[in-house]
A protein has these predicted regions:
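Residues forming the flavin
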Residues: 1-427
Length: 427
């Protein structure tokens, strides 16, 4: 069951001409796609490459939904595609496989007050700097300070902001930060060759093909200055941000006046990913990343048959790794659909109906919904008792029901007590 939210625009009639958002009077809403550095209207297309390329009305900011007035987009639409009467729909689809690719969120700069996050407008995240660099971004590719729109001459990048910090609750490495910081620093130098770029880092983890050479190029050819050490404080002085930190290689403290500070904040699982994992009976770790069936042999499969993983929902990874994993997941799905019959593991639970007392404790603990209730009848057709029955098509052989059974009437096929004892006696 899929909830399709109402967009209040008829996809069959809309041609994507853009007249509606050009005429919309509500124009100062922070844009999610531009990381809240730019603005959008109350009717908008989420991003230029959206599929379908049809706008959606933000009902929380639309004057019609707030006050019952306006309707300008409806009046100017040449195809009469605006439909304020639309409602959310529940769509039911029968599918043979599911690929979970929920993506990730980045930690917000506001969570790092000691680094100026939330206090200074010119302290931004790497994602925001990415949008500033883009020619279709809020500044049309010009590197300008968010506070006063002046050109940036000195920029300081701070790596591992939130990553590998136990007190922030994120002990893992975000994996992508070292490389995108090097990329951002190089792009800044390309756009402003006379500008200065500094990078504070703890360790450079450039473990991919050509990654180490890329970082060396940033240092040796582009003149990016790397300082190994932590930043202790950021404060304002004479209209600039002063970054105070340590250079552990020289054993000195440094202060750098900067126009812009970019925080390489940690990545974490997408909000709501745990809820989705629970719906599909997929386990996840303490950080919220979904668990694969086997880290080496079955890296894109899960404990639930027919459910596969792709991208950062499984662990932090960059674009090449995400594409490779998505291709592997798609191949697994095609392999699943290529045969007329589906294979399953023989190690499924089986119930001894003669000893089952019908307490159904197993039913409540089964994460896959494989336990069903079965009526046992005599020769006359009268119901003698109701017992548990395992659907072998759904059972994954996890053994949760075996542990929960009070009368010890459930076993895993191939692992019954008498079979295990026989194997031991044969040694």
């Amino acid at each position: 069951r899929i909830r399709k939210k109402a967009r209040y625009v008829d996809e069959r009639k809309c041609t994507g001409c853009g007249l509606c958002w050009l005429k919309c009077p509500v124009k100062r809403i922070p844009s999610e796609f531009d990381a809240f550095l730019g603005t959008r209207t109350a009717i908008y297309t989420p991003f230029p490459q959206a599929v379908p390329n049809v706008p959606v009305i933000d009902r929380e900011n639309c004057l019609f939904f707030k006050r019952g007035t306006c309707r300008i987009c409806e009046k100017v639409c040449p195809t009469k595609a605006i439909s304020y009467e639309q409602e959310d729909e529940i769509i039911e689809e029968m599918v043979g496989a599911v690929v979970l690719a929920t993506g990730y969120d980045v930690m917000d700069a506001d969570e790092f007050g000691e680094l100026g996050g939330g206090r200074f407008k010119d302290v931004i995240t790497g994602l925001q700097f990415e949008r500033i660099l883009s020619s279709s971004g809020p500044t049309s590719g010009k590197i300008l300070r968010p506070s006063d729109k002046k050109e940036v001459e000195t920029v300081v990048f701070i790596s591992c902001v939130g990553s590998r910090e136990r007190y922030k609750g994120i002990e893992y490495c975000s994996k992508i930060c070292c490389m995108y910081v090097a990329k951002h620093a190089m792009l800044f130098k390309h756009k402003n060759p006379k500008g200065k770029a500094y990078v504070f880092y703890m360790d450079i983890r450039a473990g991919g093909k050509g990654y180490e050479e890329f970082v060396r190029r940033a240092i040796e050819e582009e003149g990016v200055i790397y300082l190994r050490g932590r930043v202790s404080r950021i404060y304002e002085r004479d209209g600039k941000l002063v970054v105070r930190g340590a250079d552990s290689l020289s054993g000195t403290q440094v202060e750098i006046p900067a126009d812009l500070v970019v925080l390489a904040t940690a990545i974490r699982p997408k909000e709501g990913a745990e809820s989705i994992a629970q719906k599909f009976h997929v386990s996840y770790d303490s950080h919220g990343f979904m668990n694969e069936l086997h880290p080496k042999l079955r890296p894109v499969e899960t404990a639930t048959a027919g459910v596969f993983l792709a991208g950062v929902c499984q662990a932090p990874k960059d674009i090449p790794d995400s594409v490779a994993q998505a291709s592997a997941a798609a191949s697994k799905v095609l392999a699943l659909f290529s045969s007329d019959e589906l294979e399953r593991e023989p190690t499924v639970a089986i119930v001894d109906e003669s000893t089952c007392v019908g307490c159904f404790a197993c039913e409540s603990v089964c994460p896959f919904g494989a336990i069903e209730r079965k009526e046992v009848r005599d020769r006359a057709g009268n119901v003698i008792k109701v017992v548990s029955h395992v659907n072998p098509g759904l059972c994954q052989g996890c053994g949760a029901c075996v542990v929960a059974c009070r009368s010890q009437c459930i076993d895993i096929e191939g692992y019954r007590s008498e079979e295990v004892f026989a194997e031991i006696m044969a040694l």
